[in-house]
Regions:
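Outer-membrane beta-barrel proteins and related beta-barrel translocases across Gram-negative bacteria
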Residues: 1-471
Length: 471
């Protein structure tokens, strides 16, 4: 008798368990005209634990092409999560020895990383990386069936990291950015862009102070730094680029120093000194080629230090005046009227950094076709990342006079209490005089007034009077 006997070839075994399972991934097969028959997307899945897995795949073609890839997901609860993908392909199209035979190596990297905001209040890391060589999607068989991926013209990647050392007030933050144009294989990369910040501290303050505070203990300073390194190039030239000659880099420092002192118990003195330094790896010297009637640029590589500084000092005090209204006229409602006068004067100075002794500005003679000669001024550091100090000397004296008038009256809600009423919250005048200016050194006179008429309503007005309007 014909008794049906069921026969089956096991294709895969998937046990239903509560734990993660590792196992083989069966490949798919097919035929691709340029690369031949293939087995692809076969490999092994590693269920390492409930926080991390790994999938390894491979592909091979009968005409010599092959590729491997690795994909991983990770997740640590309340800490971080992300995914990573890497693929490498060695693609050979056509038959070896024939004129249309081509061989290309390409790869792709994707990385996404997210950190929980509560994981570490002092440090953070985030990443969104999507990098691929320009030929990768054209050689990837999966992309042929995904027009959106195949026609993608730009890719962007970024990684950012920051940390804070609260005990010393130091903060670091860094980013790396990459932009790709897949059509012409151009790359714009910044690696790294680092910011350093040191919060205000008092370098001369004694750890174990005894007695009154010394004047030098009131001197404070801070620091900010910025390091940047960037390049615009082609994909195949990136790994062969020279850090000094091909990359655009620099380091900028800023150090403000200040203090606050009291003179004769009534006058507040506040000096300050600001220093900025720029470090570059090259400069561009310019000259004029009279025969060709064009400017000639000569790039000189080496360490270049470009700095500038400024200083200032200010003095201010407060003068108080009181008026007790006559009770016969005003009764006992108004207790007193107070007038506070705050005069201040400040002086700021910065030298002329276009002077020849600094070397930040140069000149050359340009001989025109008609025989006339012009003197051209330029800066060898004009196109650098952090610029060049400005031209011109500064010597400025500023004056300011501020008035405040308040009235102390009995509170209608409390028979034993008093409250303050603002009559004139501020009435101020300010003007400055530039000693370095060759003409019109006096600035305009600025007057400002602020009145608080009601609890939530403030009136502000500013008027400017031109010092040389009738000159």
């Amino acid at each position: 008798a014909d008794v049906p006997l069921p026969l089956a070839i096991p294709y895969g075994f998937f046990p239903f368990t509560k734990s993660y399972s590792s196992g083989f991934i069966m490949p798919t097969y097919g035929d691709e005209s340029a690369r031949g028959f293939y087995l692809r997307d076969g490999g092994y899945y590693f269920a390492i634990n409930d926080k991390w897995d790994l999938k390894l795949l491979g592909e091979i073609y009968t005409k010599g092409s092959w590729g491997v890839s690795a994909a991983s997901n990770y997740n640590k609860r309340y800490r971080y999560s992300g995914s990573f993908y890497f693929s490498y392909q060695d693609t050979k199209n056509g038959d070896k020895g024939m004129p249309d035979f081509t061989s290309q190596k390409s790869f792709k990297i994707q990385w996404n990383h997210r950190q929980d905001q509560k994981a570490n209040p002092y440090s953070s890391l985030s990443a969104s990386v999507n990098f691929a060589t320009s030929s990768y999607e054209r050689n990837n068989l999966s992309s042929l069936y995904n027009p959106q991926t195949l026609t993608q013209s730009t890719r962007t990647s970024s990684v950012s990291w920051s940390t804070t050392f609260s005990s010393i007030g130091l903060s670091l933050s860094s980013t790396a950015n990459l932009s790709q144009n897949m059509r012409d294989s151009s790359i714009a990369m910044t690696l790294p862009d680092l910011n350093i910040s040191l919060s205000r501290f008092y370098p001369f303050k004694r750890k174990h102070a005894a007695g009154d505070e010394r004047w030098y203990e009131k001197i404070s300073m801070s620091y900010t730094g910025h390091i940047s390194n960037s390049i615009n190039t082609k994909e195949d030239k990136l790994l062969h680029s020279n850090l000094i000659k091909d990359w655009r880099n620099g380091w900028n420092h800023s150090i403000p120093i200040s203090g606050n002192f009291t003179l004769f118990n009534y006058i507040n003195i506040s000096p300050s000194f600001n220093f900025q330094d720029r470090m570059y790896t090259h400069k561009v010297m310019r000259s004029w080629d009279a025969a060709a009637q064009r400017e000639v640029c000569d790039t000189i590589y080496g360490f270049n230090n470009v700095y500038n500084y400024s200083m200032s000092i200010g003095a201010s005090t407060k003068l108080y005046g009181f008026y007790m209204p006559s009770r016969k006229i005003f009764g006992d409602k108004i207790q007193a009227i107070r007038h506070v006068l705050t005069p201040s004067v400040s002086f700021s100075y910065a030298p002329d950094f276009s002077a020849s002794r600094y070397g930040y500005y140069k000149t050359y003679q340009r001989t025109n076709a008609d025989g006339s000669v012009d003197l051209v001024e330029y800066s060898p550091y004009k196109d650098q990342l952090f610029g060049v100090p400005g031209k011109g000397k500064t010597g400025n004296i500023a004056f300011d006079l501020s008035n405040n008038v308040e009235m102390k009256v009995k509170s209608s809600k409390d028979s034993t209490g008093f409250k303050k009423l603002s009559i004139i919250d501020e009435l101020g005048l300010s003007m400055s005089y530039n000693m370095a200016a060759k003409e019109k050194p006096l600035s305009d006179l600025t007057m400002r007034i602020r009145l608080k008429w009601w609890k939530n309503y403030t009136f502000n007005m500013t008027a400017v009077f031109a010092s040389y309007a009738y000159v």
